[in-house]
Amino acid sequence: MSDAEDIPTGRKRRPREQTPVQRALGLLVRREHSRKELTRKLTARGIEDEAAQAAVAKLTEAGWQDDTRFAENLVRMRANTGYGPIHVRAELGTHGLDSAAIAAAMDSYEGDWQENARDLVRRRFGEAGPQDLTQRRKAADLLARRGFDGDSIRRATRYDPDD
């Protein structure tokens, strides 16, 4: 053997390629994902569709991935950041959840959507709320963009568009 072969090259070992289950688990450790979202992310990272679905199924069986838990967390998180039930329901639909799971998640929310609308208006317009018609319209537009229904908007802004 020559001396050149005995000298370490200083190169680091390449890390082993992660399995689809390991990659999916890495995503789930960061935050909850729906089955559809997790499968989509795995296939986007170059994992074959069948392998991605098998990995997600294995993690679902083991309790690491749960669409019900994901939906309940999303409802709570969006409600706490000022979004209304219409927006939240639509977002849950984009994550591939069926209507029964969406309804169950919305029913599990223990907060009050109208109180959330009032809180959002208070944060934007002060404790007294919107005073004149222009401010009430702006508050109503804000709540509508955030996904609140008409009844919640009227109660939170004391604004009736027929005035």
Swiss-Prot record:
Superkingdom, taxonomy of origin: Bacteria
GO (cellular component) term, any one: cytoplasm
Keyword entries, A-Z: Cytoplasm
Keyword Cytoplasm applies: yes
Pfam families reported in the protein's UniProt record: RecX_HTH1, RecX_HTH2, RecX_HTH3
Location of this chain's protein in the cell: Cytoplasm
InterPro entries linked to this entry: RecX_HTH_1st, RecX_HTH_2nd, RecX_HTH_3rd, Regulatory_RecX, WH-like_DNA-bd_sf
Location of the region described as Disordered in the Swiss-Prot/TrEMBL record: 1-21
Listed GO biological process terms: regulation of DNA repair
Sequence similarity: Belongs to the RecX family.
Role this protein plays: Modulates RecA activity.
Protein name stated in the entry: Regulatory protein RecX
Lineage, highest ranks first: Bacteria, Pseudomonadati, Pseudomonadota, Gammaproteobacteria, Lysobacterales
